[in-house]
Amino acid sequence: KIMELLIFVSKITNRIFYIFELILKDELGINFKFTTDKDKFLSHEGPKLHYGDHPLENNEGLYQQSVNLLFERDITDPNVKICKHNDSKAIFPVFNEKSLFCFDIFSASFYIISRYEEYLPHVCDHYNRFQPQDSILYKMDMIEKPIINIWAKELGEIIKSKYPDIQLKKKSFKFIPTYDIDAAWSYRNKGFFRTTAAFFRDILKLDKKEIKRRFDVLTNKKMDPFDTFDYQIELQKELKIKPLYFILCGDYNTNDKNISIKNKEFQELIKHLGDYALVGIHPSFSSYLKKDVIKEEIKRLSEVLNREITISRQHFLRLCLPTSYQILSELDITDDYTMGYASQAGFRAGYADTFPFFDLENDTKTKLNIHPFALMDGTMKDYLDLDVHESFDKAKKLIDEVKNVNGTFILLWHNETLSGEKRWEGWITLYRKILDYALK
């Protein structure tokens, strides 16, 4: 018989059900059931845990003191306090010495993973994005740690030491490379007007090198520098990795400079990538919060590939909770890969694994799966201003963190980074080193 953990709570809310399921079942593999019957709980012989604001007399089982957060439905500002925990930090301190942890591990995890703080008033950056420095993890200096996985592991060890018969899940580390295709080519397939305009721009700038480079590519003397797709497929075969691709299919504008989806060569490329990998939509900058625009972009990609599109990642990582996720769900997207920051490496939701999106506005667990990424090429280059050596150290540190908790490490890269040209000099070798390190 599989051991079950009986959990006593004064009431079962959607928030409670969601976070206990995530930590106990998904992360630790522990089966459990809830009861609100105190006597049933006290007389229960097997493994048991009480979660509530004060301990019960005669409880032989485990006790975790609670704060109010999970018993509520409304989105109020809980005025989060940071406290010490072992050699690091936590939030939502509790003070009863019988409590398993000196903080409410379930409320703390829920607050972070639900992105509660992103529903509260905050100042966005110039692309309408929530800023990492406003997050509690940043203030705790824990943004580069998969903190929920770490806490869950500690909880698992405590439960196991009290109830040795409980089986914990054996998780294994996974590595998923992903590519955002914002512009498949640097010079080719840009159409007559864009190409002519670019030539005139180079002439005005007297940029002889660039004029020659463009001319050589357009006359097929040289490969287009952004055309690194053969190399990606080679890596895929050699290292037996399964990447994901997100394709920008929006209308051309300042922030969406993709190749037109009507272009035949672009369509061929998309089909070619689709033969080797799972391909998803990269909703454009200008589709932000516009359901009909995203719907049209999904339709364009779906028609090229002749299959349903179920995975997505926002261009510029523009994400507004819960609206962005509500829209994607309504458009039959099942899995989103946007969760992460542009300006900061690490774990936006404190978790290095897939989790279901909990919609705080409607107080429900949804069917949309969130896949957080830990590292993006542009973050290191443009925001943190790291060279290739520092970038490798950053990647190594994050991969080690995820390996430590047997989580999933998702890497976000772009085809142009693998050109190894101009600003991306040395980045092909860096990419290969990161892959080798993750896979060893």
Model-derived features: positions:
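Terminal accessory/targeting
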Residues: 1-261, 353, 360, 364-440
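Catalytic domains of cell-wall/extracellular-matrix polysaccharide-remodeling enzymes
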Residues: 16, 286-365, 422-424
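Generic enzyme active-site microenvironment
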Residues: 178, 280, 313
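Conserved hydrophobic/aromatic pocket- or pore-lining residues that grip, position, or stack substrates
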Residues: 180, 282, 328
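Residues within well-ordered alpha-helices
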Residues: 232, 268-269, 324, 398
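Acidic, glycine-rich loop-and-beta core segments that form the ion-binding/anion-interacting portion
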Residues: 233, 239-309
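Anion (oxyanion) recognition and catalysis
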Residues: 237, 273-274, 329, 403
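Short acidic/histidine-rich active-site segments
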Residues: 280-282, 338-341, 412-416
